[in-house]
């Protein structure tokens, strides 16, 4: 491999000749060989959009000439298009401010912009990473701004569409399952009846509420730290920079961003991203419950509850022939566990904003994006490989319904709670039906029993 010599304020550094990064990126690459977690590509692209917006605004403010602005914008567009993905090698486990990733971006843009302007970045710097690309900025305000951009963008473009897809499927299932009466269960024990549509309407409502909660968390996430520079005072930044960059990003990305009204808050706290992830954790909890219920209701096929039939996607056992497992449900529940773990990490990291700067930024955004990707991908997978194919096992549903002792609840208004309990206990002890038990105890006539104990009349309130 051929190398060139780059330099920074600490001296000279050898850098692979085919790479566009510079000295500070190389130092980080060599100093932090920790784990395999790299800066997510979507974060890199959000950062490039930010640098593009800054170049445009600095040009409008008269601080950056047209030639450099045009070259920087083109370099950013190429990064966003994925042409330089292999030039962003840094680990998440680096400085907690994200400074080295900010400089990685600055160096790649500067060297590519120099090339665009006709220069050879290996010999000269027509565009400087600090003086031009990082003009009026600090890592302390650019990295959290990139975090906000990518978080909002991915929630809107990836998470919500995947959630909407699952919501649409459950809306269809509620309609399909209307009129199918089944036994309810509380405490893992038989309870009073409801319809399968009512049960699934609960799942649907949970998903709708999760969507509302996630969307409701976004307004403060749209507040950008840019313009705060090092500690929130805006030192070396034009007073109009923050507002103009927010407007530029809104136009560029197509979703609303605003300048944070308090830059000291924006640099030292990540409560907004913590709040949004909390809503995502709420979605994970709902998905855990829904997937668990569905796999229990589909358990069997002969010795379980067996009230639902789910798609058979692959063999389930390496030793038991013919076994099929609820694998999509299991994947969703594992994702939910991971998201809950990420929430703990994000919450603790967000609490560590010592003085003017939180220095846990990379791990916060990495875990946030991992949770978002896992939730979106698992919902899509669960939907197409399981949810759309869920069918009721009507024979098993009817069998379980009519063998449940909890239908005795319908007798409460007519013979009282204690007598109804005697009917249920007598039936259970002797292995007879509720009707037989009632007749044996002489509490109501057969005609009245048939009138009172009617599952179709037990699925809603009655005056």
From Swiss-Prot:
Q: In which pathway does it act?
A: Carbohydrate metabolism; tricarboxylic acid cycle; (S)-malate from fumarate: step 1/1
Where in the sequence is the signal peptide annotated?
none
An MF annotation (GO) of this entry? fumarate hydratase activity
Keywords (alphabetical) are: Cytoplasm, Lyase, Tricarboxylic acid cycle
Q: Which InterPro entries match?
A: Fum_hydII, Fumarase/histidase_N, Fumarase_C_C, Fumarate_lyase_CS, Fumarate_lyase_fam, Fumarate_lyase_N, L-Aspartase-like
The biological process GO terms on file are:
fumarate metabolic process; malate metabolic process; tricarboxylic acid cycle
Enumerate the subcellular locations listed in this protein's record, separating them with semicolons: Cytoplasm
Reaction(s) catalysed (UniProt annotation): (S)-malate = fumarate + H2O
Looking at the UniProt record for this protein, which Gene Ontology cellular component terms does it annotate, in alphabetical order?
cytoplasm
Q: Which Pfam families does this one have?
A: FumaraseC_C (PF10415), Lyase_1 (PF00206)
CDD domains annotated for this entry?
Fumarase_classII (cd01362)
Presence of keyword Lyase:
yes
User: What else does UniProt say about it?
Assistant: There are 2 substrate-binding sites: the catalytic A site, and the non-catalytic B site that may play a role in the transfer of substrate or product between the active site and the solvent. Alternatively, the B site may bind allosteric effectors.
Self-association state and partner proteins as the record states: Homotetramer.
What protein name does the entry list? Fumarate hydratase class II
Q: What organism does the UniProt record list as the source? A: Campylobacter jejuni subsp. jejuni serotype O:2 (strain ATCC 700819 / NCTC 11168)
